[in-house]
Every structure is written in structure tokens, then in C-alpha cells.
Amino acid sequence: MDDFAQEWPNLPRSDNGLQMDQLVGDLPTDGGFEPQTRARSNTWPCPRPEPVDELDSTKASNQQLANGDPQQAMQNANAAKKNSSRRNAWGNLSYADLITHAIGSATDKRLTLSQIYEWMVQNVSYFKDKGDSNSSAGWKNSIRHNLSLHNRFMRVQNEGTGKSSWWMLNPEAKPGKSVRRRAASMETSRYEKRRGRAKKRVEALRQAGVVGLNDATPSPSSSVSEGLDHFPESPLHSGSYQLSPDFRQRASSNASSCGRLSPIRALDLEPDWGFPVDYPNTTLTQAQVQVFDQLAGSMADELKLHTDMLQQQGFSAASGLPTQPPPPYQPPQHPQHTQGYALNGPGLSPNSVTTTMSPAYPNSEPSSDSLNTYSNVLLEAAADNAALLVQQQQQQQQQQQHASTLIGQCLEALNSEPIEEFNLENFQGGLECNVEELLHQELCYDGMLDINIPLAAVNTNATNVILTNNSTNSSSSNSNNSVAGNSSANLQLSQLQAQLQLQQQQQQQQQQQQQQQQQQQQLLLSNNNNNNNNSLDTASANLNARVQYTQPSVVTSPPSWVH
């Protein structure tokens, strides 16, 4: 207090505009009142420790590790930082520094995770009483976090099976403060490189004479590119900032701004594969269009046959159950209400079914009467559906058989047309026939004459052939060469009989093939009927199971899905 009792110096007062620095310079200075820097908040800060230079400390620790004395390195690091405040409870070293000392102290410069834990407990006094499982969860988690976070540590697979991996110091890590692994979105170097490449590409295209960003027709890129025409003096027109030709805002899209699309084709930034850019308009003739329409219609009819059958019936297995969530629980009511429900199915009138049903409520028992009636209705509807399916399949089978019979009749009609050359009724009377010349001419072929006569034609003209044979026999008997005539007639008859037998065999084979085809079609139809019946049985069983599981005992009000 004696210092404050001294008189303060009297400053000379002057009005001649002296500077403040000159006035302050005349004041006595004291070592304890040196000017201090102020923070950005313009308040005098409390004295705080100076920031620790982590780069120097890491270099010192790395040098001590290179000398091979981790304990001395820890002591030197603590001595260098004795004037600063402690960063952690055990000292100024971080978890990464402790792990580095632990790995560097090993003989082979590698440790497992459990060995790092043991080194911490043995060498750091703070962790000596925290080695048990209850108190070590926190700092062990921090060690694992730092091992996976820093680039200076690398993980090496252990040679033995079932053993933990080795942790070693990464020799390729940068010296000084270790760089933390960042996410891909935080690394801006790649983004800057990509952005620079885009700028260079756009500038090269612009220098080559490619213009078309801001033409008369606006492009759906962005409001910035659209405003460049209205503000030609904008700095965006300068060469320092160029928009990409395919630039588009995130909010806009081609779907939302299709009316504002520019007809100008985008710049050829994609590789050219040699294909023409504008494809010609291919037009089909009317005949091709009709053929395609018929083909599409037949395919659509075949695909939608089953669905149309179900729609015509007006009843499906899935539509027979309510799909709405159950309402909240209500107290049970003893009187039951009987309500008529109409099922639009074949063979069922709207008033022919009367059931007792209610939606599924929790904490309620199923009603046997309502279950039985509802299941009976569903079974009857399923049976009607099966009967309709069988009828439709029978109709299809009959149509197929009718078509096959029509084809067979047409073939028979074609084969049964009599050949005019062999029809003797068409010849007029009074004709003369030189039988001797005819027999002589036929015998000259040495039995190689082949006459193909259809079976129907032979059947219709059998009497005529027999008459002609008799006439030839009589004429030959009257002639001098009766023996030769009889032998030739017998040869002709034998040939005709052989041909008739061959034709009969061929027709029998054709009939057998047709019968086999009909049997195969019947087997396929029967298999389809069995599959449909099995599917209907399973569907009805599933419906019965679902009905028994969801129906309640007490009826309070009709379900909302019934109309």
C-alpha cells in the first residue's frame, strides 16, 4: 500500500493538440502492467496457459523412440511441458502418444490389443488401479478408437489362427501431428480437382467456338444461366467463371420443366460410338399394322383368359375377407343381429344367403353358427366356381374336337372326290375298245405299271371296274389269245388289290395317329382339370382356416366391407 501513497506526477496541460502516445510515454512503466492483447470480444481475458506446440512434442517423442528409451522420452516430454496445464488426468501425452510409446518399447515393434492394455496398466500410474473390467471400459474404448482413427498405426494380420491382429507403427505416416482419417465428403481436394477439370474443359470448348449456353430458347439449367441474358454486364459473363453446358439446379428437373426444354442438342461430351445421332422415323404399312394387331390381340386373349373367367364369376377368394384393421375393443353385447349379405356369384341370388357375422375384435370368442354358415357359403361358391371351370374346359374341349372333326371331314372330302379319268359313267355309249392292243401295251411294261387310285374312288367305282374286268375277260375268251388275256387281267386285278391293301393300311395308320392325338389332348385336359380342382381345394381350405381364425362370437354391427 506504500506504493499507492506516492503522489502521481502532474501532467502538463496543453491545448496544442499533443498526441496520446506522447502523453502515455511520460507515464512511469512497471513490469507488472505490460500491455496485453485482447480477445475478439474486447474484454480483458484471464491469464491462460500458452498453447502447447504438439508438433515439437511429437518430434521429440519420435526422436526418443528412435534412441530406444521410451521412459526417458516420457520424462523429457513432461519436463518440456511442465509450465503448461495438464491436458489429461495422467499428463500431457495423448492416447496416441501413449500407444506410440507402447509399440516402440516392444522388441519386435508390434503389440496386440491386450498387450497394449497391459503396458498401459504397468507403465502409466493413472491406469494402475484401473485394470479391472469395471473401471477399464472407458479408457480401453478410447485406445481402440485412437488405433483405428490415426494414420500412424496400422493393423497386421496375425499368422496364428484364432489370435488377435498385430498393431504396428506405420513407417509411411507423415511426421509430426498425425492426420485423422476423414470421410469422403470432408475431403475437398478431390472436389477441387474435379471442379478445376470441369472449368478447363468448358474453357477449351468455349475457345473452340462452341456457343449455345444462352440462346434465344432458354434451357432448363438454372435461374442463374437464365438471368445472364437479362444482365449482360454480370461478372458471370467473364472468363473467370463459366457455367457448365449441362449445369442444372438440384431443385429443377426435366420432368418439371419439360415445356421449357431447349431444342438445341447438348454438347458432345460423351464418347462417339459411331452411331447416327438422329434416328429416322420408321413407318409401318397398313398390312403390317393389321398383322401386329392380330398377333397382339391373340396373345392378350390367351393371357387374360383366366382373369376374365374369374371376373365373370364375380367372386374371388381374396375378396371374401375384410382387410380393414379392427376397431377398438367394445364391451360384448348379448343380442345378436342377423344381417343378409349378398355374394355376387353364379348361382347365388342377392337374398339367398343370410349369415351372422361381425368384424374381428380382440378378447372375443368365435361363434360356431356364424363360422359354419360363412364357411358353407364360401364352399358353395368355390364349388360353383369349380363347376364353371369344368364346364368351360369341356366347352373348349368340344370346340377343339369339333375343329379336328371339321379338318378330318375336309380331308376326306378332298380325298373322296372321284377322278374323272377313272369314272366310267362319264363315257358315252357306242365306244369301241381294242382289248388286244391294250393288253399288249400293258404287258410291254413288264409289270412296272403303277396306278394310284384313292380308296373312295375305288369304292365308288368298284362295280364299274368289275364290269370292265368281266367284259375284258369275255372279250379275251372270244379272242384267239384267251390265255394271254386272262393272265394280264389277273395281273391287273392283283395289282389293284395290292394297291387297295396299301391304301387301307395307310388310312388305318392315319386313324391310329389321330386317336393317339385325341388321347393326348384328353390327358392334358384332365391334368388341367385336376390342377384347377387342387388349387380350388387349397383356396377353399385357406379360406376356411382364415375364417375360423378371424370370426368372433358376438355381433355388434356389420363389417364395413359389406355393401
UniProtKB/Swiss-Prot annotation:
Bias (Polar residues) ranges: 58-72, 216-225, 349-358
Positions of post-translational Phosphothreonine modification: T43
Coiled-coil residue windows: none
Localization, UniProt: Cytoplasm; Nucleus
Superkingdom as given in the UniProt entry: Eukaryota
Major localisation: cytoplasm
Record flagged with keyword Lipoprotein: no
InterPro entries reported for this sequence: Fork_head_dom, TF_fork_head_CS_2, WH-like_DNA-bd_sf, WH_DNA-bd_sf
Keywords: Activator, Cell cycle, Cytoplasm, Developmental protein, Differentiation, DNA-binding, Growth regulation, Nucleus, Phosphoprotein, Transcription, Transcription regulation
Compositional bias of kind Pro residues: 323-334
Subunit structure: Interacts with melt.
UniProt name for this protein: Forkhead box protein O
UniProt source species: Drosophila mojavensis
